[in-house]
From Swiss-Prot:
GO terms for cellular component: AP-1 adaptor complex; cell division site; cell tip; clathrin-coated pit; clathrin-coated vesicle; cytosol; endosome; Golgi apparatus. GO terms for biological process: endosome to plasma membrane protein transport; Golgi to endosome transport; Golgi to plasma membrane protein transport; retrograde transport, endosome to Golgi; vesicle-mediated transport. SUPFAM superfamilies: Second domain of Mu2 adaptin subunit (ap50) of ap2 adaptor, SNARE-like. This is AP-1 complex subunit mu-1. PANTHER family: AP COMPLEX SUBUNIT MU (PTHR10529). Component of the adaptor complexes which link clathrin to receptors in coated vesicles. Clathrin-associated protein complexes are believed to interact with the cytoplasmic tails of membrane proteins, leading to their selection and concentration. It is found in: Cytoplasmic vesicle, Clathrin-coated vesicle membrane; Membrane, Clathrin-coated pit. It holds the Pfam family Adap_comp_sub. InterPro entries: Adaptor_comp_med_subunit, AP2_Mu_C_sf, AP_mu_sigma_su, Clathrin_mu, Clathrin_mu_CS, Longin-like_dom_sf, MHD. Belongs to the adaptor complexes medium subunit family. Residues 167-425 form the MHD domain.
């Protein structure tokens, strides 16, 4: 529960505010920045939750603004932080950019949104699709249509009633991003899998969906066995449509989905991951005038799978020139802005090996410079459809609509791709 919401600039000046409960003086916001600076100086780090004289200051920082909630109650700080994050997402959906200028340019719209997303200090709806049915923006003005959508007052705020499709379909994508750092000898230094289940729902009415995965915890709790592998997910996060109480009780993922595309859940796995594509790179310096690279790339995933649009980014000396390349597959480009050569392989089948040889001139490089250059790792980018590193599987996706009683077709796809860090040290 929040008593008031403020949007401040970096100097702590109020851009816009909304008092919901009138139980605290609005002037206390002036203490926010001094209090924040004092805590950072004492503790050596910042914290998103501050308390002073019985008032809680809960905030997030985005670009050049602070979104601040003040509360006199003993509120759930995490709940308020999630609300502020979702409020920021709503503003971004409306303005494209959340910054001081966009807030000032859309004062009327911001006030309308603040009135709808919170009522008497209690969060209401932060689903942009629902808000856009009620509040629309044209040339920085707001048009309000009555009556409000039923979803605004429903328990199911993320979905409107009366949705109809001629063809009822659900597309489910399991997307896994692999972060990996490996040493030159093949030892995996660090690895993790970040996964998400993304749905595109084109379903009429108010459908009930149940999703079954090869969840290890589920089968152990039920004392059942399953043919094939099971997976143990960590840090699982769900969209608000998922019935958490039921999941905690019997691990069933049941929900009434929003219309269109959304991320149903995300998860992490920290198990040791074998490099999906292994790269060995050897370089030889010839009399300080040129450098030669011998590169081998091997796909270490299942033979029936194919990696698409593989990029192998190999560092080279910054002032290397006159590149010449030979490769058994794909093509190589010199990227001087990255001080690297980029080996592009359109299709890389599992179990295959490809080779590349490169030769470049060294007009001014010194031996010690080359030693420093070797410390830069090889980076990889790729996407492998119909494959998951973790082995996660969708066992079933059941769709029921008790009133309309239609048959819907679910489509399931899998893809594994590189994460933000996929590198092999040389």
């Amino acid at each position: 529960m929040a008593s008031a919401i403020f949007v401040l600039n970096l100097k702590g000046k109020v851009i816009i505010s909304r008092d919901y409960r009138a139980d605290i003086p609005m002037s206390v916001v002036e203490k926010f920045l001094p209090l924040k600076s004092e805590v950072e100086e004492e503790q050596g780090f910042s914290t998103p939750c501050l308390t002073h004289e019985g008032i809680n200051y809960i905030y997030i920082h985005h670009n050049d603004v602070y979104l601040l909630a003040l509360s006199k109650m003993n509120s759930d700080a995490m709940e308020m932080l999630v609300f502020l994050r979702k409020m920021a997402d709503v503003f971004i959906d409306y303005f494209k950019e959340l910054q001081e200028e966009s807030i000032r340019d859309n004062f009327v719209l911001v006030y309308e949104l603040l009135d709808e997303i919170m009522d008497f200090g209690f969060p209401q709806t932060t689903e942009t699709k629902i808000l856009q049915e009620y509040i629309t923006q044209t040339s920085n003005t707001v048009k309000k249509h009555a009556p409000p959508p039923i979803a605004m007052t429903n328990a199911i705020s993320w979905r409107s009633e009366g949705i109809h499709y001629r063809k009822n379909e659900v597309f489910l994508d399991v997307i896994e991003s692999v972060n990996l750092i490996a040493a030159a000898d093949g030892t995996v230094i660090q690895s993790e899998i970040l996964g998400k289940v993304r749905l595109k729902c084109y379903l009429s009415g108010m459908p009930e969906l149940r999703l079954g995965l090869n969840d290890k915890v589920l089968f152990e709790a039920a004392g059942r066995t399953i043919k094939g592998n099971t997976v143990e997910m960590e840090d699982v996060k769900f969209h608000q449509c998922v019935r958490l109480a039921r999941f905690e009780n019997d691990r069933t993922i049941s929900f009434i989905p929003p219309d269109g595309e959304f991320d149903l859940m995300s998860y992490r796995m920290s198990s040791n991951v074998r490099p999906l594509i292994w790269v060995e790179c050897e370089s030889i310096v010839h009399s300080g005038s040129r450098i030669e690279f011998m590169v081998k790339a091997k796909a270490q995933f299942k033979k029936r799978c194919i990696a698409n649009n593989v990029q192998i980014i190999i560092p080279v000396p910054e002032d290397a020139d006159s590149p010449r390349f030979q490769t058994s597959n794909g093509h190589v480009q010199y990227a001087p802005e990255q001080a690297a050569m980029v080996w592009n392989i359109k299709k890389f089948a599992g179990g295959k090996e490809f080779f590349m040889r490169a030769e470049m001139g060294l007009p001014s490089v010194k031996n010690e410079d080359i030693q420093v250059q070797k410390k830069r790792p090889v980076q990889l980018k790729f996407a492998i459809p119909y494959f998951t590193t973790s082995g996660i599987q969708v066992r079933y996706l059941k769709i029921t609509e008790p009133k309309l009683n239609y048959h819907a077709m679910p489509w399931v796809r899998y893809v594994t791709q590189n994460g933000t860090e996929y590198s092999i040290r040389q």
